[in-house]
Each structure stands twice: as structure tokens, then as C-alpha cells.
Amino acid sequence: MIPRSYYWLLLASTLLMASAFVVSKLFIVDGIHPLVLVASRFTLAGALAIIWLSLRRQLETPKTLSDVGGVFLVGTLQTAVLFGTGFIAMEHLSAATISLLTLTMPIWVTGMLALINRKFPPLLQLIALGVGMAGVALIIGSGVSQAGMGELQWFALALVGAACWASATVFTKTSGLSITGWSLNAWQMLVGGGEVLILALAMDLPGIKLVLVSDILLFIWLVVPASILSFGFWFSALKLGGAAVTSGYLFLIPLFTALISVPVLNASFAPMQLLGGVAVGAAVWLMSRSPT
């Protein structure tokens, strides 16, 4: 029997992850460059997580060149590319839309594993793939009809990020890395954040200027609760409920993002966007119920 704490961990982690999209959008609207925000957030979050794990003597370190390469690959795909593309797209799209497109990751994973294993997915997964693709089409179609074809590139950019996250997930599932959980997340955040930091410095982008107390508090929230704690709670939930069941609740992230966006960002959504969001959420839920 799954303990009640599992659902509290699940609720806390998805709510914190959702808040990260909204807070990031606030900073981007205020003029902070998306790449600078990614670099600052994840370099600091990764460093703090590594220090915290070291103090608790729970930090796992890469032991072979294969592990080092694996950590760099995951960090590049799951932090640098995922959030780099997502935050750039967020300059033009709503936080809820980016959240929805990012959370198509389980759908991409299913397709990739089917190609790698050369095995036809189970019927329920095929249904989920179809529903998910229809949902993405509705979200993109509604957005393009409102803003024009010029916005299509930003939807595509967010989907590229989701596909890269899926690639990192497939790699961690199949590579047998010796580093897992909290430690892998800490290292990959530091690596990905560091890569984007180097890029931001090379582009001579202006740094973050946090003048108001509210800005400082929001940035602390973005780094600690919305980055370090959210993933920590998520890993704890995975241990209690298993990956299959837990991944079915990923749809809560775009749902919470949309709910928070309404009062904080004065967001509004077209009926087709809402229908597409429901379809993507249903697809993720169906994926978790499908036999592997």
C-alpha cells in the first residue's frame, strides 16, 4: 500500500516545478535574458545541491570516463538544451504552453524506446501516442491561429527541448550509469548550467540585476524550492510509488502552471489550447498505465 506521504511529495514536487515556469516567465518579462536566467539558476542550484550532498556524505561522484561522459551528456540535454530552448521560447509563448510542450517528454520516450528496441509499443501506448500528438497539434494550431505562422518556430523550439529531455531519460535508463538520483541531478544541473554560462559569457549577455527584495526572494525560490527541493521530492516519490505510476502525475505540472499563471501573469487560454492540454495530460496518464 502506498503511504499518504507519497501523495504529499507528489503534490509538493509538481506544484514547485509549476511555480518555476511562472517565476521564470516573470523574470523574462522583466528583461532578463533567458540564457542568463538558465545559467544562473542551474549553476547555483547544482553547486548548492553538491555542497549539501557532500555535507551529508551522500554525494556520488563519477568513477570512470564513461560516467563523466554520461553526466555531461545528461547535463547538456536535460538542462542546457531543455531549459535553454524552453526559456528562449518563453519570450514569445506563455509559461503554461511551454510547460505543456515540455511535458510531452514521456510520449517522446515511448517512441524512442520503440525504435531502439525494435518492438511495437503496446496498444495502450499507441493510443496514448495518438492522443498526445493530437493534443500537441491542438496547442500549436491554436497558438499559430492567434499569433500567426511566425510563432511556429517557438513551438518547435520547445518541442526540441522536450525531445532532448526524452533522449537524456532514455540514456539514463539504458546506459547503466553508476550515479543516480539526487547526485546525478546535482551534477547534471551544474554541468548544464555551466555550459549555458559559458555561452552567455561568450555572447557578452548582461548579467542578472536583482534590485528589489521581491526579485531576490523570487530568485532564491527559483533556485532552492523550485529546482533543488522539487526534484528531491520527485525522486522520493519515485522510490515510494515507482516510476510507472508516478510519471502518470506529470500532467499536474502544466495544470498547476496554468492555474498559477491566471492570477500572477493574467493569462488566458483559448478553448482549443485547453482541449490540447487535457489531451496531453491524458496521454501522459495513459502511458503510466500501459504495461512495459
Model-derived segments and their meaning:
Residues 27, 37, 41, 89, ...:
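Hydrophobic/aromatic residues within transmembrane alpha-helices
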Residues 13, 40, 79, 83, ...:
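Helix-helix packing/entry segments at the starts of transmembrane helices
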Residues 18, 22, 75-80, 84, ...:
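Hydrophobic/small/kink-forming positions within alpha-helical transmembrane segments
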Residues 49, 121-143, 196, 251, ...:
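Hydrophobic transmembrane alpha-helices of multi-pass small-molecule transport proteins
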Residues 48-53, 86, 105-130, 255-275:
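C-terminal transmembrane-helix exit sites in multi-pass transporters
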Residues 49, 109-111, 115, 146-204, ...:
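Transmembrane alpha-helical segments that form core, pore/gating elements
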Residues 16, 20-21, 50-102, 138, ...:
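Specific transmembrane alpha-helical segments of multi-pass solute transporters/efflux pumps
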